[in-house]
Amino acid sequence: MTSNPVYLLHGFGTSAARTWRDNGWIDLLADAGREVIAPDLLGHGDQDKPHDPEAYIAVEDAALAALDRGADGTTVDAIGFSMGSRTILALASVHPERFGRIVVSGVGANLFRHNDDPAFLANAIAADAVPENPAAAYFHQMARTPGNDPQALAAFLRRPQSWPITDEGLARIELPVLVVIGDDDFAGPADPLVERLPDARLVTLPRTDHFATPKSFPFIDAALDFLGAAP
């Protein structure tokens, strides 16, 4: 097993600090002797929070640039959650040579549900009143977590998609990939994603929903073991 730096990408509406640092990931990886690269995506955490959807067209390019700055040209292992997983898969489909082993969580069949409308959640987030739909209400309230900017997060969802997830792109990721999904995660099931990746294995977390995934001890254990960074 290698000692590659580990590139961590958080999910939508959160940050590197809340997803990775607060749940112990960064300390555990440091204890294993692994360098950590954990940027915030544009519109999140310490990054700028523009309100124009066009400003987010280069989200994936910025994520790749952060990887390049942190890794200085070396291969990285990667762990993503939700939007971070989608971003890592998009990057690896174009630049598989940049990655060693990949862990994605909180994604699955949702990547291929083309009738899912990001505008629905964007409108829910931007609304003044809490929506009646439970999922919309959750995202509406999550966008108002301290440090978040609801209008920036709505713009993020409305951005033009310049790095699509395609079957052809996923087939180019001829790397070991661990797919982790909670059995109560709305993003699942994960089988459609696993079937499209040449070298993937699946771990299902019992009694775990989408938002509980980053702090799941079985997830942490499985990911660190997969990367050869277990205590």
Task: Go through each PLM region and give its residues.
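Conserved alpha/beta-hydrolase "nucleophile elbow" surrounding the catalytic nucleophile
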Residues: 10, 80-85
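The serine-hydrolase catalytic nucleophile loop
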Residues: 13-26
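Active-site nucleophile elbow and catalytic-triad environment of alpha/beta-hydrolase enzymes
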Residues: 152-169, 183-186
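Short beta-strand/loop motif that positions the catalytic acidic residue
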Residues: 173, 179-181
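Flexible "cap/lid" loop of the alpha/beta hydrolase fold
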Residues: 86-94, 99-129
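Conserved acidic catalytic loop of the alpha/beta-hydrolase fold
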Residues: 58-76
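Catalytic histidine-centered segment of alpha/beta-hydrolase-like enzymes
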Residues: 208-220
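Conserved alpha/beta-hydrolase
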Residues: 29-48
